[in-house]
């Protein structure tokens, strides 16, 4: 989104639609801006402030790679670059992914892995299920994706949701982990296709719907709720302590 461009105009429309919907909460999963400048971020913040539902914002590579403030502006505007919240029996959690060097790979900082592990250990009481959010997929786009998966694998994660590629694509976490994952659309999918994703989660399934502005939602894909099977890559989950301790 740039001040005055078509994305800005359609972000306003998306906010209006969301405010009239029955959505429980809103998650912005990175790439809010083109170049991550302070001016662009402040402009997006002024639009998102009109959302009348709980809002959680994660930065993407466009916010970190070209940040004018070493990502400090994200904290100044939204208070943090990670979040956790609960909705009924769901624990919804998201962390940042960099890159923290220009043109580098995505990277999960050790302090964020530490926070994720401790946070899920605290929130995952009996009967809880986890939805994980990150701008990057659980693939080699993240240079330490295996460490990330090892933390997630300890908890009842039923889905990981990412952006970055600006398309819909269902996949399973790369190489190990067996975590069900879904890439989702961006606001602008070109050729006048502006919109967002609606997630429906019930006891048995996670479903993703493409919501083009001004049109009815269309089912895209989904999966039955299941939990990653234990394999040789990760030690038994039973009585496992946090990987990252103070």
Model-derived regions: residue spans:
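Histidine-centered catalytic micro-motifs
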Residues: 132-139, 158-168
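N-terminal active-site segment of His-dependent metallophosphoesterases
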Residues: 1-42
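Extended active-site neighborhood of metal-dependent phosphoesterases/phosphodiesterases
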Residues: 38-126, 147-159, 170-184, 190-202, ...
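Short acidic, glycine-rich surface-loop motifs adjacent to enzyme active sites
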Residues: 118-140
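Acidic-and-aromatic substrate-binding clefts and catalytic sites of carbohydrate-active enzymes
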Residues: 3-6, 32-39, 64-68, 138-142, ...
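Active-site glycine-centered loops adjacent to acidic/histidine catalytic or metal-binding residues
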Residues: 30-31, 60-61, 135, 163-164
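Conserved acidic residues
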Residues: 24-26, 130, 158
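A short C-terminal boundary segment appended to hydrolase-like catalytic domains
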Residues: 200-246
């Amino acid at each position: 989104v740039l001040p005055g461009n078509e994305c800005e105009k359609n972000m306003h429309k998306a906010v209006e639609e969301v405010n009239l919907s029955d959505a429980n909460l809103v998650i912005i999963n990175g790439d809010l801006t083109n170049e991550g400048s302070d001016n662009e971020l402040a402009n997006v913040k002024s639009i998102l402030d009109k959302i009348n539902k709980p809002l959680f914002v994660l930065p993407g590579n466009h916010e970190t790679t070209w940040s004018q403030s070493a990502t400090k502006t994200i904290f100044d505007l939204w208070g943090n670059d990670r979040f956790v919240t609960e909705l009924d029996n769901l624990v919804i959690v998201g962390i940042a992914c960099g890159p923290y060097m220009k043109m580098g790979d995505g990277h999960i900082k050790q302090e964020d892995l530490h926070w994720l592990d401790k946070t899920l250990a605290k929130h995952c009481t009996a009967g809880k299920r986890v939805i994980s959010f990150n701008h990057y997929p659980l693939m080699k786009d993240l240079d330490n994706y295996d460490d990330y998966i090892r933390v997630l694998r300890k908890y009842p994660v039923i889905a990981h949701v990412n952006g970055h590629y600006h398309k819909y694509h269902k996949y399973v976490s790369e190489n190990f982990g067996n975590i069900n994952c879904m890439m989702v659309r961006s606001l602008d999918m070109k050729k006048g296709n502006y919109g967002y994703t609606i997630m429906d989660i019930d006891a048995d399934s996670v479903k993703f719907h493409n919501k083009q502005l001004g049109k009815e939602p269309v089912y895209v894909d989904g999966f039955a709720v299941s939990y990653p099977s234990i394999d040789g890559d990760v030690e038994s989950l039973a009585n496992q302590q946090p990987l990252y301790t103070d």
